[in-house]
């Protein structure tokens, strides 16, 4: 499993499902999964957590939400970007670091974005067409051992 993931695109729900799948496939237990909202906390808290050994477990997961410091947006919090870049260049071997940048347009001129795009596994979720959406709904039902007709699945987006 990779050590750094970056989730992009405007389908927040699909990104959430992919993130949950990574969490489920990891060996981290609920005490070693931490979420940080970058609109409320400095990225240094997440980096410090990522560098701390997991508690009675082999691995831990750190998830960043709303990392607007990767965009051109004006910020209320001054983030420790240098510390984050340093971490990205040498991620912890026992931490899966997930950045959920759903619905954000990254500023590719920033050093942190360049490093992130270089080191992270990038997952991008775009809006589904009506046909793709129906297929996706049917697959979700099937994965949960349930059945749904195509017509019934179409009612989800009417």
Task: Give short role names for the model-derived ranges.
Residues 1-158:
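Conserved beta/loop motifs at nucleotide-recognition and modification sites
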């Amino acid at each position: 499993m990779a050590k750094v993931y970056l989730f992009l695109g405007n389908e927040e729900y699909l990104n959430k499902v992919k993130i949950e799948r990574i969490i489920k496939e990891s060996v981290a237990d609920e005490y070693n999964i931490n979420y940080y909202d970058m609109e409320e906390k400095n990225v240094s808290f997440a980096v410090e957590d990522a560098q701390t050994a997991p508690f009675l477990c082999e691995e831990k997961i750190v998830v960043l939400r709303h990392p607007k410091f990767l965009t051109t947006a004006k910020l209320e919090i001054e983030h420790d970007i240098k510390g984050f870049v340093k971490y990205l260049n040498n991620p912890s071997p026992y931490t899966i670091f997930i950045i959920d940048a759903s619905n954000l347009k990254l500023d590719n001129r920033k050093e942190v974005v360049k490093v992130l795009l270089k080191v992270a596994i990038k997952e991008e979720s775009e809006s589904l067409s009506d046909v793709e959406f129906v297929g996706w709904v049917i697959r979700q039902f099937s994965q949960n051992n349930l059945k749904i007709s195509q017509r019934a699945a179409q009612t989800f987006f009417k």
